[in-house]
């Protein structure tokens, strides 16, 4: 039995997107043992993935930390991997390749660089959609891809009956009005107005809820919506995924939870400004759609609510 390594460090949205590619790698190597190397936030989560046999932790310490680098590379070499699928495709993972398999081609180390089409360069190739890039990488590496273009993140779910009973959650609309502090361009400023429109229209038919991350709990209190926590702490990724999957509708900025919603077949809507496009991040699905504008400040709550009504 040979050993296969998949590398996927993060972020949350990236993890959800890669689910189909990971499944295809596993199903194309049924007689191999599948290892996945990731970072601490996703180490325990990936242990739940049925297509992975073992998870390896990469602390991603600085490259100049030679002691850490030495022990990590020594550990990886002991597995004697017959093939590596680099789904992170970062400068860091290219650095790892240069240490582990400096002369390897796509038959040993599959990445966007080793599978790059002859008629383009990496800069142009990276402008394509995420899932299309994964699909090309795996197909060019000789894999039959059935799931790459339609990732299913439902493997991350867990039972949340106790949380739903505590907050009396039956039919609910789940909002994610947050974004990373350094990416404020992604933030739509009218969630408070949207909440009022939803409540005026549906009254008690749907609860309006927010599930903040650990650093978003204080900000969440600014909104007229029920805040969903577990013992006064933010939900973990598995709980959050289940809450999203079982929702009636999701409205989110372009953040990790939006990508989860897209890839668990939840109904919903995500809002895009000029920072990128819904096509490039492969977020639109059968049940999950986007609104793309040049300036999120000019996207009215009424416009979002109208789209919500059409999709709900």
Predicted features by range, described:
Residues 152-218:
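Active-site donor-nucleotide binding/catalytic segment of nucleotide-sugar enzymes
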Residues 7-18, 45, 180-189:
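A short, glycine/small-residue-rich beta-strand->loop->alpha-helix junction that serves as a flexible
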Residues 15-27, 41-44, 194:
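Short amphipathic alpha-helix
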Residues 33-65, 225-229:
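Conserved nucleotide-sugar phosphate-binding/catalytic loop shared by glycosyltransferases and other
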Residues 56-152, 172-177, 181, 275-278, ...:
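Conserved nucleotide-diphosphate donor binding/catalytic pocket of glycan-assembly enzymes
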Residues 190-269, 273-276:
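Donor-binding and catalytic core of enzymes assembling or modifying cell-surface/extracellular glycoconjugates
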Residues 111-112, 230, 234, 259-312:
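Nucleotide-sugar donor-binding patch of glycosyltransferase catalytic domains
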Residues 1-12, 175:
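Nucleotide-activated donor-dependent transferases that construct or modify glycoconjugates
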